[in-house]
């Protein structure tokens, strides 16, 4: 087919022609990399023209996959994160379900806390718990929410709560039988003032010893005793632990024994979204968190420690004091900024005030996973064997260097 007179020079390159392309005033180089090189003429190349042919890629050339660009709108929820841990073999399906039920309980409690004044959930309930403490209305409701979520999971065998006298065997359990200990609402005395509060939990390995047995004719006291024995485990046995802080935002902090992760509740989607990975507490910090209103009832060695923190020393900068009155709130700040939180024994509380099983042990498990330390002043908290459900111990927790410094004063 002959080219028309009006054909442009470039049109010669688009046609399979036997004519010479030399007719083009200024031949264009299609492949600059081949410019100046001799190209062998084979059956697909003709001296009188050019045919458009596909060129096979060089088999020796390495093709690198394009880097995946992370979208600014990509969110990883707590649920998807747990499923990934399950796929990696870090946890099993049963534990994933238990964790999801705890997250659901925390969402419900967060809503109750935010609407406490509107829903008339402030003030005391009129009852006293096993510790002799006045129960707030939200204490009772939060305990019910937590317990119901764990029961409905079908994967929990025993639950032990600050608000319950003894551990409770969950009859509805289908499989899993995990032991879950929790404080449904820590810092509830702050509710009326809308100050930070939180929930604390710990999860231990499955255990069947406390489940109801239709063939067991023993007295209820014997069954309760078996429950207590199986729940009273040292913190070293924890599989997972965490807390949820109800503050300006709702933050769910979790460890499965390999790092500490934080998830923030997105009110738009109603989901906990991963916001911090592998949190590490600073090795030291210039913040201390103690209730100094009890100073006169403390041990002399502890008084000396606090006095030295206030001394500017050669640096000219004393430690800063920060105290909220909520274990979760004070601990979360310490985890991020470093320093030390302490609730010591005193003349009024000979054994301390915080509970070992569902407050001190879970928090110590978290802080150690972040590189910190939890101590009763002399021993590692996770090594202490509980002798009763509501056992109290002194607690000093935070940056490793700060806790070890305090232990030297108390030695």
From Swiss-Prot:
It catalyses: beta-D-fructose 1,6-bisphosphate + H2O = beta-D-fructose 6-phosphate + phosphate. Mg(2+) 3 binds at residues 183, 186, 359. Pathway: Carbohydrate biosynthesis; Calvin cycle. Mg(2+) 2 binds at residues 162, 183, 185. Mg(2+) 1 binds at residues 133, 162. It is found in: Plastid, Chloroplast stroma. Its cofactor is Mg(2+). One of its GO terms (cellular component) is chloroplast stroma. CDD domains: FBPase (cd00354). Binds 3 Mg(2+) ions per subunit. SUPFAM superfamilies: Carbohydrate phosphatase. Residues 1-53 form a transit peptide. Belongs to the FBPase class 1 family. Homotetramer. In plants there are two FBPase isozymes: one in the cytosol and the other in the chloroplast. PANTHER family: FRUCTOSE-1,6-BISPHOSPHATASE-RELATED, FRUCTOSE-BISPHOSPHATASE. This is Fructose-1,6-bisphosphatase, chloroplastic. It comes from Brassica napus (Rape).
